[in-house]
Swiss-Prot record:
GO terms for molecular function: GTP binding; GTPase activity; ribosomal small subunit binding; small ribosomal subunit rRNA binding. InterPro entries: G_ERA_dom (IPR030388), GTP-bd (IPR006073), GTPase_Era-like (IPR005662), KH_dom-like_a/b (IPR015946), KH_dom_type_2 (IPR004044), KH_sf_prok-type (IPR009019), P-loop_NTPase (IPR027417), Small_GTP-bd (IPR005225). Residues 16-23 are annotated as: G1. Residues 42-46 are annotated as: G2. The lineage of its organism: Bacteria, Pseudomonadati, Pseudomonadota, Gammaproteobacteria, Enterobacterales. Keywords: Cell inner membrane, Cell membrane, Cytoplasm, GTP-binding, Membrane, Nucleotide-binding, Ribosome biogenesis, RNA-binding, rRNA-binding. It comes from Yersinia enterocolitica serotype O:8 / biotype 1B (strain NCTC 13174 / 8081). An essential GTPase that binds both GDP and GTP, with rapid nucleotide exchange. Plays a role in 16S rRNA processing and 30S ribosomal subunit biogenesis and possibly also in cell cycle regulation and energy metabolism. The gene is era. It is found in: Cytoplasm; Cell inner membrane. Coiled coil: none annotated. Residues 207-284 form the KH type-2 domain. This is GTPase Era. It is a peripheral membrane protein. Residues 125-128 are annotated as: G4.
Length: 303
């Protein structure tokens, strides 16, 4: 009788302040894109699990919203609670910081991490953007004094530099356990959720600085069609009439571009043809209303 192969499985939280590259790191660790990215802070609003299975190892990464001090709006409070609760019951935390920058938000995150029982790996992202490399070593020494890190790894998530080192450390700290997900799973999120995230990413990419924090997307219809693809109806919610005009653009040009780009990404992700229709609606005060936020899928509970 042959011996049953041991399997290893663990949860790894990716945390840090907004806009340090957490989602880019997750996508690179998975080898494909499941978490939306942009150059704007607070792109990630929900916790997203990314699942990477390789042989006997299954790493379940939890990409969290950026932790930040500002909590004036209900959406910011929910994002902070979602990020904080993600680090409570994991095998390993990857704390992502940006180059030689250190802010009050970074300090707040490390204060939360000091009380954890699990090991914390520090990933210094965007080191390729540090122009004065002589500042890097002193900064690494400064960071190493903040708490007892498992290891400190300089990386460039965007270029894939040293991401394999992160993955290797993750494997070494996975407990022996059954896999939680089938080996072909890459995320715990539904196709409907991923469709809304793709549309939101395009909104952030093609619109101005102010709008992204006042916009969300609700998928009203996601149904298979007779051609083997999907009919998807997306409702874009904004807070003011002026924002609605901004999303639609001159003679509908902006929403058309957003729709084309989103449809292409959906077809690549779902491996099927997509018929996408988008509408824009004004819903005043949605980002300040916790009940409305929860109805739109914002939550501080792991799903």
């Amino acid at each position: 009788m042959s011996e049953v192969e041991k399997t290893y499985c663990g949860f790894i939280a990716i945390v840090g302040r907004p806009n340090v590259g957490k989602s880019t790191l997750l996508n690179e660790l998975l080898g494909q894109k499941i978490s939306i990215t942009s150059r704007k802070p607070q792109t990630t609003r929900h916790r997203i699990m990314g699942i990477h299975t390789e042989g006997p190892y299954q790493a379940i990464y939890v990409d969290t919203p950026g932790l930040h001090i500002e909590e004036k709006r209900a959406i910011n409070r929910l994002m902070n609670r979602a990020a904080s609760s993600s680090i409570g019951d994991v095998e390993l935390v990857i704390f992502v910081v940006e180059g030689t920058n250190w802010t009050a938000d970074d300090e707040m995150v490390v204060n939360k991490l000091r009380s954890l029982q699990c090991p914390v790996l520090l990933a210094i992202n965007k080191v390729d953007n540090v122009t004065d490399k002589t500042k890097l070593l002193p900064h690494i020494q400064f960071l190493s004094q903040q708490m007892n890190f498992l290891d400190v790894v300089p990386i460039s998530a965007e270029k894939g530099m040293n991401v394999d080192t992160i993955a290797s450390i993750v494997r070494k700290h996975m407990p022996e356990a059954d896999h939680h997900f089938p080996e072909d799973y890459i995320t715990d999120r539904s196709q409907r959720f991923m469709a809304s995230e793709i549309i939101r990413e395009k909104l952030m990419r093609f619109l101005g600085e102010e709008l992204p924090y006042s916009v969300t997307v609700e998928i009203e219809q996601f149904v298979p069609n007779e051609r083997g693809g999907y009919n998807i109806h997306g409702l874009i919610l904004v807070e003011r009439e002026g924002q609605k005009k901004m999303v639609i653009g001159n003679k509908g040009s902006k929403i058309k571009t957003i729709g084309i780009e989103a449809r292409q990404d959906m077809e690549q992700m779902f491996e099927a043809k997509v018929h996408l229709e988008l509408w824009v609606k004004v819903k005043s005060g949605w980002a300040d209303d916790e009940r409305a936020l929860r109805s739109l899928g914002y939550t501080d509970d792991l799903k």
